[in-house]
Amino acid sequence: MTSQRTRERLIQRLYEEGLSNAQVLEVIRRTPRHLFVDEALAHRAYEDTALPIGHNQTISQPYMVARMSELLLAAGPLDKVLEIGTGSGYQTAVLAQLVERVFSVERIKVLQDRAKERLVELNLRNVVFRWGDGWEGWPALAPYNGIIVTAVATDVPQALLDQLAPGGRLVIPVGSGEVQQLMLIIREDEGFSRHVLGAVRFVPLLNGPLA
């Protein structure tokens, strides 16, 4: 079930659901999602669904990975992106093939260590990792042209807004429980523009690093 035909079916489905960025779709097509899930779930890797990866975390559904990547890239190529929530490393791997540099923060060290191994296996060398609190971002290396958050925050973290470069784009799910909305926030000359893009479902963005 990890055949090229299975991957092509996934890409066709994403296209039919309205995703149109050819570069993003090509990266999704060639990225081996089965490497980012447990072997017991590998037969489901190219279903358009989230899957558990342990520690009460999930690998996001391919549609959402592609959608959030499209939103980041909508204004053109990016050279410096901050990812909050490395998780399995799948979204990280997709970003690493779309932008010049990725800086990824994860609070669960064992998940990030596994993600590092997978990216090395795929020879993706333009990612720098930090084990820490995603609510804080990575201020030492700010600002970022794009920020993507792969867990739902109860509110938009001020630290992430502060670390967004002028013209930069922040893609983040906001809310709690059953009420979550995907938001696109753009840093403008006079402040921030906010766009609500529809209902989503993510695991919560928690505070503090966890070994």
Swiss-Prot record:
InterPro entries: PCMT, SAM-dependent_MTases_sf. It is found in: Cytoplasm. Keywords: Cytoplasm, Methyltransferase, S-adenosyl-L-methionine, Transferase. The active site is at S60. One of its GO terms (molecular function) is protein-L-isoaspartate (D-aspartate) O-methyltransferase activity. The keyword Transcription regulation does not apply. It catalyses: [protein]-L-isoaspartate + S-adenosyl-L-methionine = [protein]-L-isoaspartate alpha-methyl ester + S-adenosyl-L-homocysteine. Pfam families: PCMT (PF01135). GO terms for biological process: methylation; protein modification process; protein repair. One of its GO terms (cellular component) is cytoplasm. It comes from the Bacteria. It is an enzyme of class 2 (transferase). Its main location: cytoplasm. Its EC number is 2.1.1.77. The keyword Methyltransferase applies. Catalyzes the methyl esterification of L-isoaspartyl residues in peptides and proteins that result from spontaneous decomposition of normal L-aspartyl and L-asparaginyl residues. It plays a role in the repair and/or degradation of damaged proteins. Belongs to the methyltransferase superfamily. L-isoaspartyl/D-aspartyl protein methyltransferase family. This is Protein-L-isoaspartate O-methyltransferase. It comes from Pseudomonas fluorescens (strain SBW25). The gene is pcm.
